[in-house]
């Protein structure tokens, strides 16, 4: 019986971090769910900057309120707290925080810190036990989590076509800490963005999925400084993906092409980058889920770095072999081996890109 229950629970747990949420309140059209996890995590690597304790905790809530028969209000907040640092260090941050309204079949609109629409497709490969999803990053235009997202989403195409979903999104400027490009939440140039727009469309049918997403953001003056490579008026992203999720098998792949949007270590952005991620997983009925993945990000026509001219270089390239074992819906353990395929050379040293392998061991409690 336990084996059969695990085979049903594990796929649900992988859909979203809040899939296993604890219901705190549900009365008179108001609902509040609390979710979170504690990951006792350790890295083993020759790279001393990551080797060691990586323990962290995430905590969040999702709430809904029934305004009318046709209108529902909702909100979500998620926070991460590092458990590997001293108590006097402020190593915690908000991952998402947004509120919105859903108009039955018409769609939903929300605003706040949220995921960019590009992640509607690239999230399909961001399912590895620990690593993965790093051909892009947070606060990187509209590629993943970011600030100031206004998002319209429509599920099942106005209730007419099951599985056909689309989204349209706008992101406001997040600029510098001072000067003409200053905004109230200013940050370093590598995490800034100008006004941006994007959209996504996905279709799921009997376990098969296909999707595409695009985004285009104005770049800030700081980002076009001579201090950085990859200057340009706009940062653009074009992505497409496929997935299969049925019969205990999960397969997914995505290809993304970016212009002035993929970060090159701490040096800036690639004028053009080609990013590819692919993953294969199988869920055994007794709780074991092995995983195999390949990820690569290749920068094109990078330009001059520290007085040296670089053309085409791999920014990221590795094979990932891992496995997760689910004791039950609340407890799991995993191992994830990142086999780095990058060579230690002048480019990686100039860009500050890690070329060492990493083994991650984790023990997770989630609710």
UniProtKB/Swiss-Prot annotation:
Biological role: Forms pores that allow passive diffusion of small molecules across the outer membrane.
Leader peptide range in chain numbering: 1-21
Q: Where in the cell is it found?
A: Cell outer membrane
> Which UniProt keywords are given for this protein, alphabetically ordered?
Cell outer membrane, Ion transport, Membrane, Porin, Signal, Transmembrane, Transmembrane beta strand, Transport
GO BP term, example:
monoatomic ion transmembrane transport
Name one cellular component (GO) term. cell outer membrane
- Cite the GO molecular-function annotations of the record: porin activity
Q: Which family does it belong to?
A: Belongs to the Gram-negative porin family.
One Pfam family cited in the UniProt record for this chain: Porin_1
Q: What is this protein called?
A: Outer membrane porin C
Membrane topology, from the record: Multi-pass membrane protein
Question: Which SUPFAM superfamilies has this protein been placed in?
Answer: Porins (SSF56935)
What InterPro entries would the database entry show?
Gram-neg_bact_OMP, Porin_dom_sf, Porin_gammaproteobac, Porin_Gram-ve, Porin_Gram-ve_CS
**Primary localisation category:** membrane
Describe the protein's quaternary organization and the partners it interacts with: Homotrimer.
